[in-house]
Amino acid sequence: DQCSYCGIYCCPPKFCTSAGCRSP
């Protein structure tokens, strides 16, 4: 998977934003 870290780990289909991990 292409998980990102933005305060917490965030894996598709969720995505990182300036507010943290968001759902699509």
From Swiss-Prot:
The modification Proline amide is found at P24. GO terms for molecular function: toxin activity. GO terms for cellular component: extracellular region. The keyword Manganese does not apply. It comes from the Eukaryota. The keyword Disulfide bond applies. Expressed by the venom duct. Transmembrane segments: none annotated. Keywords: Amidation, Disulfide bond, Secreted, Toxin. It is found in: Secreted. Disulfide bonds join C3-C11, C6-C16, C10-C21. 1 uM of this toxin does not show any effect on voltage-gated sodium and potassium channels. Shows a turbid zone of antibacterial activity against the Gram-positive strain Bacillus megaterium (ATCC13632), but does not show antibacterial activity against other Gram-positive bacteria, and on Gram-negative bacteria. The cysteine framework is VI/VII (C-C-CC-C-C). Negative results: does not show effect on Nav1.1, Nav1.2, Nav1.3, Nav1.4, Nav1.5, Nav1.6, Nav1.7. Does not show effect on Kv1.1, Kv1.3, Kv1.4, Kv1.5, Kv1.6 and Kv3.1. This is Conotoxin Lo6/7a.
